[in-house]
Regions:
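Extracytoplasmic ligand-binding site segments that recognize negatively charged/polar headgroups
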Residues: 121, 160-166, 176-206, 239-263
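Bacterial Sec-exported substrate-binding components of ABC uptake systems
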Residues: 12, 23-100, 209-245, 363-370
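Alpha-helical, coiled-coil/dimerization segments enriched in small aliphatic residues
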Residues: 118-122, 130, 255-281
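Bacterial N-terminal signal peptides that target proteins for export
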Residues: 1-11
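C-terminal motif of bacterial Sec signal peptides marking the signal peptidase cleavage site
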Residues: 18-22
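Structured C-terminal subdomain patch of bacterial secreted/periplasmic proteins
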Residues: 194-204, 209, 218, 299-370
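A short, structured surface patch at a secondary-structure boundary
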Residues: 91-158
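Short helix-initiation/N-cap motifs at beta->coil->alpha
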Residues: 74-79, 131-143, 278-286
Length: 370
C-alpha cells in the first residue's frame, strides 16, 4: 500500500513538472514571438537601405543608338524630311557656333573634318578641343566642302540656301546626312512655331543619338535642367520681376518676346516679360518702352555690334538706354537694372543656353547665387 502511494505521488509530481515545463515553453514562445514581429520592419528597412546603396553603387546602364536610325530634319522649303543613318557619322562639317560647341562638348572633335561660322570665342572649357579641329575663318565654297568628303553636315536653316551649301536633298542623294538647328527658322514663323529652350535641349539630344553618345548628351541637358529647376524652386512663392529683352535698331527696339528663344530664355531665367507677348514679335518705340516700364532691361549685343557706326559691343550696349535722356524716368534706369546680354546665349544657343538663362537669373535674383 505504501509503495502504491509513493508511485502515485511520483506520478503526480511528474505530471506537475511536465505541465510547468509546457507552460514555460508556451511563455518562452510568446516572449520571443513579439520581438520577431517588431523586428521585421527594422529588417525590411535595412534591406531597403542595402538595396538602395547597391543600386547607387551599380553603374547606370549606358544607352546605345540602334542603327539604322531615322531622324526628322527640314529642307529649305521649311518642310519636314527624314534621313536614315546606317551608322554614326565619321566625317562632319559643322556650321555655326552652337553646332561646333555641341559636337565638341559631346567629345566628337575627332569627327569634325571642317567647321566655320563662330560668332565669338569658343567656350573656355572647349578651347583645347577646338584647337584640334580644321576651322575656316571664311566660309568655303560648296565645292571645297564636297572635297572634304563629309558624311554629315549640321548647321542652320541659312546653311542650306543656294548661296551656301544648297538644299538638303543634294546632300541626301549623296548619302550625306543633314541636321538643321530647330531654332534657326527652319520650321517657319516663330508665332506659329515658338522657339524654346526645350528645342535647344533637343538639338543636343538628337546629335547625341546620331553619334551614339546619348549618355553625354543627356548629362549635359540634365545639368541645364537642374539649374533651371533651382530658379523655379526659388520663385515658387515669389513674384517675378518684369523685364524686356531688346536690341537697339537705331531709334526703335527689336523685341525678343515670348515666341522667340531670347524671350523664352528670359522666362526660364525668372523674368516676366512685359513686351513681346505671344504673336507680337515686332519692334517697339521709345514711347512703348516708357509705357511698359519694366523692372529690368536686357540689351542684346554680339561681336561687332554697333549703332550709327558707334561700337556698342559688350557692356557698352547698356549706354543706349542709360545715357538716353528720354529713358531717365524708367525704373530700370533709376535702379541700375539695365544689363548686357550676348546674342550667343539667346539665339541658336546650344551649349550657351544655360549661360543666357543664368545671365538673366543672376541679374534679377543675385541673392539666389550668394
Amino acid at each position: 500500500m505504501q509503495a502504491a502511494k509513493r508511485i502515485l505521488s511520483l506520478t503526480l509530481v511528474l505530471v506537475l513538472v511536465l505541465a510547468l515545463a509546457a507552460c514555460g515553453a508556451q511563455s518562452s514562445t510568446a516572449t520571443t514571438a513579439a520581438p520577431e514581429t517588431t523586428a521585421a520592419p527594422e529588417t525590411t528597412e535595412a534591406a531597403t537601405e542595402a538595396a538602395t546603396e547597391a543600386a547607387t553603387e551599380a553603374p547606370a546602364e549606358v544607352k546605345h543608338t540602334v542603327y539604322p536610325l531615322t531622324i526628322q530634319t527640314y529642307n529649305y522649303a521649311k518642310e519636314p524630311v527624314e534621313y536614315t543613318f546606317e551608322k554614326a557619322p565619321e566625317r562632319v562639317w559643322a556650321q555655326n557656333q552652337d553646332n561646333i560647341e555641341i559636337l565638341l562638348a559631346l567629345g566628337l572633335a575627332d569627327k569634325i573634318v571642317g567647321a566655320c561660322g563662330l560668332d565669338g570665342d569658343v567656350r573656355e572649357d572647349l578651347k583645347a578641343d577646338f584647337e584640334t579641329i580644321n576651322y575656316y575663318d571664311k566660309m568655303p565654297s560648296k565645292e571645297e566642302i564636297i572635297a572634304l568628303n563629309p558624311d554629315f553636315i549640321t548647321g542652320w536653316y541659312s546653311t542650306f540656301s543656294d548661296k551656301r551649301l544648297g538644299d538638303v536633298d543634294f546632300w541626301h542623294e549623296r548619302n550625306v546626312g543633314t541636321y538643321m538647328a530647330l531654332n534657326s527658322a527652319c520650321r517657319g514663323k516663330a508665332a506659329e512655331n515658338p522657339q524654346t529652350v526645350e528645342d535647344e535641349y533637343q538639338d543636343i539630344l538628337t546629335l547625341g543619338e546620331i553619334f551614339d553618345v546619348q549618355d553625354r548628351a543627356e548629362a549635359i541637358v540634365n545639368d541645364m535642367k537642374a539649374q533651371v529647376q533651382q530658379i523655379e524652386d526659388y520663385l515658387a512663392d515669389k513674384t517675378r520681376l518684369t523685364a524686356a529683352v531688346l536690341e537697339d535698331e537705331g531709334g526703335t527696339y527689336r523685341v525678343y518676346g515670348e515666341d522667340v528663344l531670347g524671350g523664352n530664355v528670359a522666362i526660364h531665367g525668372g523674368a516676366e516679360l512685359v513686351v513681346g507677348k505671344h504673336g507680337n514679335n515686332g519692334s517697339i518705340s521709345a514711347e512703348d518702352l516708357i509705357l511698359a516700364n519694366p523692372d529690368a532691361i536686357f540689351m542684346v549685343w554680339y561681336d561687332g555690334y554697333s549703332v550709327g557706326d558707334v561700337d556698342y559691343a559688350g557692356d557698352h550696349v547698356v549706354k543706349l538706354i542709360t545715357e538716353n535722356p528720354a529713358f531717365a524716368s524708367l525704373d530700370a534706369v533709376k535702379n541700375g537694372r539695365v544689363y548686357p546680354i550676348n546674342l550667343s546665349g539667346i539665339y541658336c544657343s546650344g551649349m550657351r543656353t544655360i549661360d543666357g538663362i543664368l545671365d538673366v537669373a543672376k541679374n534679377l535674383y543675385p541673392e539666389l547665387y550668394q
